[in-house]
Amino acid sequence: MSLSLWQQCLARLQDELPATEFSMWIRPLQAELSDNTLALYAPNRFVLDWVRDKYLNNINGLLTSFCGADAPQLRFEVGTKPVTQTPQAAVTSNVAAPAQVAQTQPQRAAPSTRSGWDNVPAPAEPTYRSNVNVKHTFDNFVEGKSNQLARAAARQVADNPGGAYNPLFLYGGTGLGKTHLLHAVGNGIMARKPNAKVVYMHSERFVQDMVKALQNNAIEEFKRYYRSVDALLIDDIQFFANKERSQEEFFHTFNALLEGNQQIILTSDRYPKEINGVEDRLKSRFGWGLTVAIEPPELETRVAILMKKADENDILLPGEVAFFIAKRLRSNVRELEGALNRVIANANFTGRAITIDFVREALRDLLALQEKLVTIDNIQKTVAEYYKIKVADLLSKRRSRSVARPRQMAMALAKELTNHSLPEIGDAFGGRDHTTVLHACRKIEQLREESHDIKEDFSNLIRTLSS
């Protein structure tokens, strides 16, 4: 038995798991095989616990399928694989990158639990403006299925900056928590290393600083400032679009930071390759580390957000009221918090108790607008236009995938975005049974986990219908 056994496991896991999960949890592992024991080394305790909880059965099953009764025992450790005398024994889960990336990516040290972070040079002379908001932490970020991977990735970066997930690219619609996670990472890094030079900014600030440096003949100072930070957190990178000089400077800054194992975190409202007006070489680099989507919060998360926000304001919010608001306002966290602030303000001004009837009155115009915007008819038209088919196709008996999948998507959206029952949704789709609607909803939920394209389609349609 040889260490190629772990490589076989990696190949199978890469085929079986979504790309994001494999990159986030399996790729950072290192392996050592001795005395019929396979030791897997995780970069930190968080990764170790997650892999053991979520993937232990998968890995043991693969070991048994490859080795039968001779399958090695599995052991988990935090840290890096001990150095051995035989170089070829060093086996990690670093699956080969595409050829074009290998040709263009700058050379840098292999990630480890230290990641070169403790060897960062002493602070240079610039005065750093952190701009990190201390109020945004991981503790007050409400986690749900829609943002679980993004939060986990951000947590790992905060614990191990400059490591396997560099750069970290978070994308999703407005008001979903991307900025909160940026600040949470910054706070996490500085809690671990108080003297760390962590800089948060909107992409437009980078552009403004560069323009000012050019005007003042201070471009070298500009370069020194941005290339000597320990972590650079840039929000809304899509605003670099069509700014060629800024993109050129950021390209070189990006390379310099990566070569120094300095952490980069970027956010955008769309997937990197879909950002128009940004050079391909930059978009390619955005995907070198880990790219994670944040989706609109599902119902349970929306309720949790409202309850937590109310608790922070020392407001008693009945569960049924939180559910009522969450069921009707679905687009993003910012909208939810704004609606709750409005309810709280009205309650304070009038001295009335917060009930469903009170909320219905306080949010009357907002709820009316939502109900007007999101109807089954509107969903059908939007989905048909998105997939370039006819509304009549969605209502027909046709079962070809080109029609069936959009129909399932439309049904799932109707369940998510309206208050109609399953039988009512079925009636609106050509008189179908409620079990057909339920199957469609479950199918789309499954495909969102397995298919990046379906996940993107769902997010894009939610964004369109909720805007």
Swiss-Prot record:
Residues 98-111 have a biased composition (Low complexity). CDD domains: AAA (cd00009), Bac_DnaA_C (cd06571). Residues 348-467 are annotated as: Domain IV, binds dsDNA. Residues 91-130 are annotated as: Domain II. This is Chromosomal replication initiator protein DnaA. Oligomerizes as a right-handed, spiral filament on DNA at oriC. Domain I is involved in oligomerization and binding regulators, domain II is flexibile and of varying length in different bacteria, domain III forms the AAA+ region, while domain IV binds dsDNA.
